[in-house]
């Protein structure tokens, strides 16, 4: 049977798929829109499965406050171009709304939005991944987003401006812990053992080596903790000193950055071109 423009439009409106894909599905199902939708869903799932192996290390970090807490969400795609796409961002924001409403786990978020994700993968042509969601509790919360790629929420007892500035510091300086004493004992001991070995290899006497290690360990725990770091807005003071001056405290923070921990494929374009030239000469 002949497929009409009205049928194609209806299928496009309901699925968001391209015109040619809609026409193809309608032709294969003799104009039955419901069967065409089922066919496209099956086809989309197959396409999404193929795309699943593609590295998705671009994307966005989103933040939204709930009642006494905030949600931070990372959704990934393959390219920074798609990371700015309106359909991709609408999907990410829809996931965030559900997460922020009731602290939904990442597993439940993935399951709830899997069908929508598959449809988006089919439409956009890239692997899309709802990667992680983090929640932070607190009566006083301040958030900061650096572009689309970094999101920070800080919880503490301080005025809004102070917490906001601390959130900006966290975005820039990447602390791992709030205070030096929060650094896990096993991490401290591993670093201490390494520093002792380094000092001994330098030929230092044991007593001097011990003093050197003490100083290095203080520096180590300070550099990876928020309150021990030099404050980006007043580098001669630590964040801890600034907070003390203001009678403020920070109890927790969460920092997410797009793609952190994802191994990206390194592209060697020179080698690729050389290989293509060699192939043409073969």
Swiss-Prot record:
It is found in: Cytoplasm. It comes from the Bacteria. PROSITE patterns: EF_TS_1, EF_TS_2. InterPro entries: EF-Ts_dimer_sf, Transl_elong_EFTs/EF1B, Transl_elong_EFTs/EF1B_dimer, Transl_elong_Ts_CS, UBA-like_sf. Keywords: Cytoplasm, Elongation factor, Protein biosynthesis. Residues 79-82 are annotated as: Involved in Mg(2+) ion dislocation from EF-Tu. One of its GO terms (molecular function) is translation elongation factor activity. GO terms for cellular component: cytoplasm. It holds the Pfam family EF_TS. Transmembrane segments: none annotated. Associates with the EF-Tu.GDP complex and induces the exchange of GDP to GTP. It remains bound to the aminoacyl-tRNA.EF-Tu.GTP complex up to the GTP hydrolysis stage on the ribosome. Belongs to the EF-Ts family. This is Elongation factor Ts. The lineage of its organism: Bacteria, Pseudomonadati, Pseudomonadota, Gammaproteobacteria, Alteromonadales.
């Amino acid at each position: 049977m002949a497929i009409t423009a009205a049928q194609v439009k209806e299928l496009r409106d309901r699925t968001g798929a391209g015109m040619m894909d809609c026409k193809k599905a309608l032709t294969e199902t003799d104009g039955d829109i419901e069967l065409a939708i089922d066919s496209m869903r099956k086809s989309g799932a197959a396409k999404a499965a193929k795309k699943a192996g593609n590295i998705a290390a671009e994307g966005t970090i989103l933040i939204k406050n709930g009642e006494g807490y905030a949600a931070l969400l990372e959704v990934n795609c393959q390219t920074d171009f798609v990371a700015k796409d309106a359909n991709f961002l609408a999907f990410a924001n829809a996931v965030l709304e559900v997460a922020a409403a009731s602290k939904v786990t990442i597993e439940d978020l993935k399951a709830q939005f899997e069908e929508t994700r598959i449809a988006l993968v089919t439409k956009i042509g890239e692997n899309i991944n709802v990667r992680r969601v983090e929640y932070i509790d607190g009566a006083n919360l301040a958030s900061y987003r650096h572009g689309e790629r970094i999101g920070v929420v800080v919880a503490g007892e301080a005025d809004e401006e102070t917490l906001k500035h601390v959130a900006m510091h966290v975005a820039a300086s990447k602390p791992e812990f709030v205070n030096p004493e929060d650094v896990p004992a096993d991490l401290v001991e591993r670093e201490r053992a390494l520093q002792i070995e380094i000092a001994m290899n330098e030929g230092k006497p044991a007593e001097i080596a011990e003093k050197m290690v003490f100083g290095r360990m203080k520096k180590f725990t300070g550099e990876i903790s928020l309150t021990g770091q030099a404050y980006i807005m007043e580098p001669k003071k630590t964040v801890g000193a600034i907070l003390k001056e203001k009678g403020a405290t920070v109890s927790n923070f969460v920092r997410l950055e797009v793609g952190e921990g994802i191994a990206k494929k390194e592209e060697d374009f020179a080698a690729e071109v050389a290989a293509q030239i060699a192939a043409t000469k073969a």
